[in-house]
Amino acid sequence: MADLQTEIEAAWEARADISAATTGPVRTAVDEALRLLDSGEARVAEKIDGEWFTHQWLKKAVLLSFRLNPNTVMRSGALGGGVGPWWDKVPNKFDGWDAPQFEAGGFRAVPGAIVRRGAHIGKNVILMPSFVNIGGYVDEGTMVDTWVTVGSCAQIGKNVHLSGGVGIGGVLEPLQANPTIIEDNCFIGARSEVVEGVVVGEGSVLSMGVFISASTKIVDRKTGAVHIGKVPPYSVVVPGNLPDPNGGPGLYCAVIVKTVDAQTRSKTSINDLLRD
């Protein structure tokens, strides 16, 4: 994979010269990088020795693919006979699929679920009508509920529940240095938004309507500690407000009200019956 990375890095430096007319090793390298992302053999970010590391070259490969591929008429559905048409550069992950491909994939995708090619969907995932963008990674056992958006290159862990209308931010526009990450066993409440490379630590629970960006203050109500850019593992988080000491308007914040306990887990546990 080192040779592939070298090819992508060189192409990135010469990106102004790359277009839909480009052929040869650059196109081959980008196509291979997207294949690796799609299959899950590679991912834009991974945890190494307990810390998240972003493979910037894979993100660059995703961006280069937009220069290499022209817009074309697209239709969705098995063997291209579904709904549409659309005018886009990135094909649907499921284009040309029939029963054997879905059985090998091992996940469930209901009508209205859209996944772009270059995104990976793990075993036992359920995709309700939702959108998973290119470079995204959804790990095993996760529920992607109705109207969820998983942004470009976002990383979703194992056994996560993304409730209805949740938005997980991408990296492509506006351009972000690192992807948004939801670690294993998290529950993200309905209509919540997590964006701009924020990391939600393992086992955390966000209530309905929590909004966290890279600049949002995440306040621990018990200790007064303020976190920026990361929700500590096993936190229970609700929307809050920081009052202005001078009597002016308060500012939005997220508040850690407690750590996850047995009662919280019972309310947010995944339903194995849905994954049989």
Curated annotation (Swiss-Prot):
Pfam families attached to this UniProt entry: Hexapep_2, THDPS_N_2
Entry EC number(s): 2.3.1.117
Binding site for substrate: 108, 145
Catalytic activity: (S)-2,3,4,5-tetrahydrodipicolinate + succinyl-CoA + H2O = (S)-2-succinylamino-6-oxoheptanedioate + CoA
Enzyme class: transferase
Chain segments annotated as coiled-coil in the UniProt record: none
Matches recorded under Gene3D superfamilies: Hexapeptide repeat proteins (2.160.10.10), Tetrahydrodipicolinate-N-succinyltransferase, N-terminal domain (1.10.166.10)
GO molecular-function term, one example from the UniProt record: 2,3,4,5-tetrahydropyridine-2,6-dicarboxylate N-succinyltransferase activity
Domain of life, source organism: Bacteria
SUBUNIT field: Homotrimer.
NCBIfam families (alphabetical): dapD, PRK11830.1
Family matches, as PANTHER family: 2,3,4,5-TETRAHYDROPYRIDINE-2,6-DICARBOXYLATE N-SUCCINYLTRANSFERASE (PTHR19136:SF52), MOLYBDENUM COFACTOR GUANYLYLTRANSFERASE (PTHR19136)
Family: Belongs to the transferase hexapeptide repeat family.
Protein name: 2,3,4,5-tetrahydropyridine-2,6-dicarboxylate N-succinyltransferase
Organism field: Caulobacter vibrioides (strain ATCC 19089 / CIP 103742 / CB 15) (Caulobacter crescentus)
